């Protein structure tokens, strides 16, 4: 594997959306520090990692109340003490709820408000910079959910509103109630279905794009070796793309990317991340990591330059026909943007 391109470039700033929010051109996804990707990591190490990121210029920090649940927000709350809060753009999310042991989605006004209050308390802040609806509640008209978020903006509890895993039509309806600043979606070399409808809609409306899992949930760092190293507590073990029947074919994609990275003098993960950075000045990827060396490597991806021909070559490695398996297990796939239409506003009876 090639040596990493050095993290020499300063992390530039970018406007996210058209409502006034400015962030670092690369953010830090914090989920894996506390949840879903194996056991929680040691808290002092993660606080040190967050402080290292901020010092390096990666200031958009991304969390959610469901990570843990709650423990990731508490971790960030500790990391933000001592004047760090003023140096970062803090993004968190609401909407995924575990009730009676079952995973559900809620966007009713009372829940939205209670979730926001809970996040403010855990994070130890008086305002959240960017507050996303993590998943769309298909029982509640999107206008109702955004209406409550609009009130939270007016009260100063949140500054900007975001959506995650929302369809183009849902984004349009939401944006008509209150301007949406950012849409978070999975976008990487092997997850490109958002390009058809959602990305153009965001661009038409002046909405920023935040790309989660830009490294294919770590796949573009190590290929099939990653899957072999996963702990039993790692939810990636259940992702169809990582199942044995799909892995062999998907591993070929990684090997091609790896070979091109060697030619470019960077790592495969830097190459995959650079591809996302090259999608436009309105795109902010938020790779997650738990290691300072990987964070430095991710920052180094900002200095990897790709020609249009190289972009096309990379894309040819991971065409829709080449990628095997869905990006989520079936139980979680029913809350992605493909299943995010909400009832008409006229159907809503306030409870």
From Swiss-Prot:
An annotated GO cellular component of this protein is:
cytoplasm
User: Which Pfam families is this protein grouped with?
Assistant: Aldo_ket_red
**Which keywords belong to this entry?**
NADP, Oxidoreductase
Binding residue positions for NADP(+): 213-223
Q: Would you say which domain of life the source belongs to?
A: Eukaryota
Give residues annotated as binding substrate.
134
- Statement: the UniProt record of this protein carries the keyword rRNA-binding: no
Quote the catalytic residue positions. Answer: 67 (proton donor)
Show the segment(s) annotated as Disordered.
Answer: 317-351
Extent of Polar residues compositional bias? 332-351
MF terms in GO = aldo-keto reductase (NADPH) activity
Q: Please name the InterPro entries in this protein's record.
A: Aldo-Keto_reductase, NADP_OxRdtase_dom, NADP_OxRdtase_dom_sf
UniProt EC number: 1.1.1.-
Family per similarity comment = Belongs to the aldo/keto reductase family.
Q: What is this protein called?
A: Probable aldo-keto reductase 2
What's the source species for this entry? Oryza sativa subsp. indica
């Amino acid at each position: 594997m090639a040596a990493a391109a050095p993290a020499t470039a300063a992390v530039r700033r970018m406007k996210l959306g058209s409502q006034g929010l400015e962030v670092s051109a690369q953010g830090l996804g914090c989920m894996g520090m506390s949840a879903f990707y194996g056991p929680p990591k040691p808290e002092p190490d993660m606080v040190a990692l967050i402080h290292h990121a901020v010092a390096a210029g990666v200031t958009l920090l991304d969390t959610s109340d469901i990570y843990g649940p709650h423990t990731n927000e508490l971790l960030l709350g500790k990391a933000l003490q001592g004047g760090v809060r003023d140096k970062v753009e803090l993004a968190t999310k609401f909407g995924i709820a575990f009730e009676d042991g079952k995973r559900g989605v809620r966007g009713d006004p009372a829940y939205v408000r209670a979730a926001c209050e809970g996040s403010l308390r855990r994070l130890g802040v008086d305002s959240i910079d960017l507050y996303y609806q993590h998943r769309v509640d298909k029982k509640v008209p999107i206008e109702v959910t955004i209406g409550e978020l609009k009130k939270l903006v007016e009260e100063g509890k949140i500054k900007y509103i975001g959506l995650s895993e929302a369809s183009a039509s849902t984004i349009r309806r939401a944006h008509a109630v209150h301007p949406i600043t950012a849409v978070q979606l999975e976008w990487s070399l092997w997850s490109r279905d958002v390009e058809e409808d959602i990305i153009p809609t965001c661009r038409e409306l002046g909405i920023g794009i935040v790309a989660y899992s830009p490294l294919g949930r770590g796949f573009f760092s190590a290929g099939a070796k990653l899957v072999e190293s996963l702990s039993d507590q790692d939810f990636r073990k259940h992702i169809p793309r990582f199942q044995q029947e799909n892995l062999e074919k998907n591993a070929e994609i990684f090997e091609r990317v790896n070979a091109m990275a060697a030619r470019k003098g960077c790592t495969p993960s830097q190459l995959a991340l650079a591809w996302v950075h090259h999608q436009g000045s309105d795109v902010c990827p938020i790779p997650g990591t738990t290691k300072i060396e990987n964070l430095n490597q991710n920052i180094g991806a900002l200095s990897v330059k790709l020609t249009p021909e190289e972009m096309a070559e990379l894309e040819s490695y991971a065409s829709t026909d080449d990628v095997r398996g869905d990006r989520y297990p079936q139980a979680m796939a029913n809350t992605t943007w493909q299943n995010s239409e909400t009832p008409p506003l006229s159907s809503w009876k306030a409870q």
